From Swiss-Prot:
Molecular function via GO: structural constituent of ribosome
InterPro entries: Ribo_uL30_ferredoxin-like_sf, Ribosomal_uL30_bac-type, Ribosomal_uL30_CS, Ribosomal_uL30_ferredoxin-like
Name of the gene: rpmD
Family: Belongs to the universal ribosomal protein uL30 family.
GO cellular component annotations of the record: cytosolic large ribosomal subunit
Subunit text: Part of the 50S ribosomal subunit.
Record-level GO BP terms: translation
PROSITE patterns: RIBOSOMAL_L30
Name this protein carries in UniProt: Large ribosomal subunit protein uL30
UniProt signal peptide: none
Keyword annotations: Ribonucleoprotein, Ribosomal protein
CDD domains the UniProt entry points to: Ribosomal_L30
Amino acid sequence: MAELKITQVRSTIGARWKQRESLRTLGLKKIRQSVVREDNAQTRGLINTVHHLVEVEEVGK
């Protein structure tokens, strides 16, 4: 299964509570922090919630 590299590029100042919690669930706390997550429906849903705060790129295994 493919993996996604998710990088936070914008601050959570002014973001809604649900967006902050989605970033926390993804494991992102600071700007320019990156995590690699499995590409599944749950991860895609979290990314969809915060698409304006993160950059996503596919990582080959």
